[in-house]
Design a protein with these regions (language model features):
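Short secondary-structure junctions
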Residues: 38, 105-110, 179
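Short small/polar-residue motifs
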Residues: 64-66, 103-109, 153
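Histidine-centered divalent-metal-coordination microenvironment in nucleic-acid enzymes
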Residues: 75-80, 106-135, 162-168
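N-terminal structured subdomain of primase-like DNA metabolism proteins
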Residues: 215-224
Length: 224
């Protein structure tokens, strides 16, 4: 049998039972319109994928279950993944200032961890939303521009379909927990659900627009 079913936390998870993979795609086949896909990675069960309601997700993330959101479809909140490879307790001030420059009036929910070796943050914006692939590529180019010109702790490679983003109060096996830093509302930290009906338009300055057009021309050259 290619897959193994594990029932946990009111979710039926699918786990690879062979080296052929495919558990994530199998979970997507069972995804209902009112559910979101999730991924769990623990020492006990390894990697497994499933689907749950946003309401149940809030209960699940109260304790560490190694849970991740799988960013599988649109819409979802604009998010940033920040990784600085040293301890810097003041880094968040700089990062938030940069985000506010590109996303005026951004309402942020911040989680993360700080160790002697690394400073990490996930930042979800409550009032900026990605509705389609073009907007996702725009956010990617903004993050890339920031990384290359202003602050290299911005990870611009996290804007892909089926990207796994660690949820609050969760951790990889034997790693620091993704702790709430700003905004105590669990809903605010979820990227793929609890999305506001109203959002601000994604602003694009001239420099970013040039980068977007260059990237599009590269893709057009590949297609032709």
């Amino acid at each position: 049998m290619q897959f193994k079913i594990i029932k946990a936390w009111k979710v039926e998870f699918i786990k690879n039972n062979t080296g052929d993979g495919g558990a994530m795609k199998e979970a997507f086949k069972q995804l209902k319109p009112d559910e979101i896909p999730i991924h769990s990675f623990t020492n006990k069960n390894g990697r497994m994928w499933g689907n749950t309601s946003p309401k149940n997700l809030l209960k699940m993330i109260e304790k560490n279950k190694g849970l991740y959101e799988v960013i599988h479809s649109f819409p979802h909140k604009v998010y940033f993944d920040i990784d600085k490879h040293e301890k810097d307790e003041n880094h968040l001030i700089k990062v938030k200032g940069i985000i506010q420059t590109y996303f005026p009036d951004a309402d942020m929910a911040v989680s993360g961890s700080i160790t002697e070796e690394k400073t990490s943050y996930h930042i979800a914006l409550q009032n900026y939303v990605i509705h389609n692939e073009d907007e996702r590529q725009t956010i990617k180019q903004i993050a890339k521009y920031i990384c290359e010109n202003e602050e290299d702790s911005f990870d611009w490679k996290v804007y892909t379909q089926n990207r796994n983003m660690k949820l609050i109060n969760q951790s990889k096996p034997n790693k620091p927990v993704q702790a709430i830093i700003e905004n105590d509302d669990y809903k605010a930290h979820c990227i793929t659900c609890f999305i506001n009906d109203y959002s601000l338009p994604i602003p694009i300055n001239e420099k970013i627009e040039v980068e977007i057009q260059i990237e599009k021309s590269k893709k057009d050259d590949i297609l032709t």
